[in-house]
Amino acid sequence: MNTQSSVTESVVRNHLQAFLEQKGVAAIVDDYDETARFHSEARTYHGKQEIGGFFVDFIGSLPAGAIERFALRTLRVDGSIAYITWSVGSEIPLGTDTFVIGNGKIVSQTFAMYAAPVQ
């Protein structure tokens, strides 16, 4: 693994750790560059403040116990790009994110997930 790939993997793992250890939104967005972009189906978030707002809403919308059931299925790194797939039990059988890392920070991220319909 080259140096850039190592940095990329480290940044993404730190980001996931902040989320999974429930360190709070401030710790989660600390991994982002000030001018980062976060792309979701609903909209593009610009900068740490808007990205933080996304995470407040996202964490609040998760099913009870979701963070404890989070499973990282795939982590692939190629230079400054990282791709992950993940799941949260049967409620969210597939989530995916792609990260672009620059100067040790997330500069761009895509996010998508499929949540099973509530029965």
Where are the regions a protein language model picked out?
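Short hydrophobic/aromatic-rich beta-strand segments that constitute the beta-sheet cores
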Residues: 38, 84, 108-109
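Short, solvent-exposed coil/turn segments at beta-strand boundaries
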Residues: 28, 77-81, 99-107
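Short, cysteine-centered beta-strand-loop-beta hairpins and adjacent loop/turn segments enriched
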Residues: 63, 89-93, 117
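Short beta-strand edge/turn micro-motifs at domain boundaries
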Residues: 94-119
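Short, low-complexity N-terminal intrinsically disordered segments enriched in polar/charged residues
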Residues: 1-30
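A solvent-exposed, acidic/Ser-Thr-rich amphipathic alpha-helical stretch
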Residues: 25-77
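Short beta-strand segments that buttress and anchor functional surface loops
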Residues: 82-90
